[in-house]
Amino acid sequence: MPTGTHRPTRRFPLVWVFAAVTALLMIAVAGYAFLSSPAAVPVFADGTSSAAPVAASPAPVQTSKSAKPTPKPSKSPKKVSFWGDTSTIPAAKNVLTVKILNRTNGKYPDSKVYWSFNGQTHSIAEQPYFDMPANSAGRMYFYLGSPTGQYKDFIEFTVGPDVFNGNTTRVDGFGLKLALRLHAHDGYDTQVGEDQATFAEDRSATFQRFQNEVPTEFKHLATVQAPYYIPAPGSDSAFRTGGQYANYFTSYAQANGVNEPTSNIFGCAGSMAGNPNMCAALNRHVAGQSQQSDPSQYYKAAPANYYAKFWHDHAINHLAYGFPYDDVAGQSSFISHGDPQYLLVAVGW
């Protein structure tokens, strides 16, 4: 073709164009009808189809920027019995097994709680048990901090071939909170000593409570040797001859036919050593009364041994050795039983 010329444009008849457009529209409509028909989804023999169900969109969760997940409640720690697990106490080869318990409420570790008996001294960490032989008698001492420390106290006992006799004592004074639990092979089980409420409180709280609960004449006992000791009134200079309270019991004692100094009445010494009933009656202020064996009548009026009363008030079953003849009418912390299995000694702060 010569340069500069144009190829003529081929024109289709208008009727052809119209026919083609019409055909395309018909195909589109037919396809839409097919896809919209249930027949378009294959149905299987069990009645199910291949079409996946359309799940409804979940409702949007309302959140807050300040909202925090609720923490799961923590489990309460398992409460440990005051006396601990007794099932692990080894059987005695001698008369009974003694186990010493640290009940200082975390004040001292086991390595700083000591016991001493018959030439042996150990911390609880070293040796928590002692196999008590027969014919043992005397005192077992307990110390906090060091085996020669000033925080100390003791229990008293005698052990026969098949029997235990013993007690805690406040006759001389208070040094440490102590409690005993004696268990025998026949099922006998008893406890004496300071109650658990007293063990639970701090030492300073016990000293303060003593001052709060006793009359004026006795308050100074909690300060004269603090923080180590609360002496019994019979050994305190204020109640001895020449002391501020030397005549505390004088008039009351004389009215009941007793001519002994106040310190001898507290300590059941002199003529009182041979007259336990009278000594107990004077200390409890029930001398001359008909109900001298009724504990509900004790310490109702002054003069009385309010030092002893305090330890009774805060002892297990209100039993304590507050003065030498506190065993009159069964009010002491003395325990005794045959065929003993073990003795637990709780040492507190």
Residue ranges and their predicted role:
Residues P2-H6, P13-Q62, A67-W349:
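Extracellular low-complexity, O-glycosylation-prone Ser/Thr/Pro/Gly-rich "stalks"
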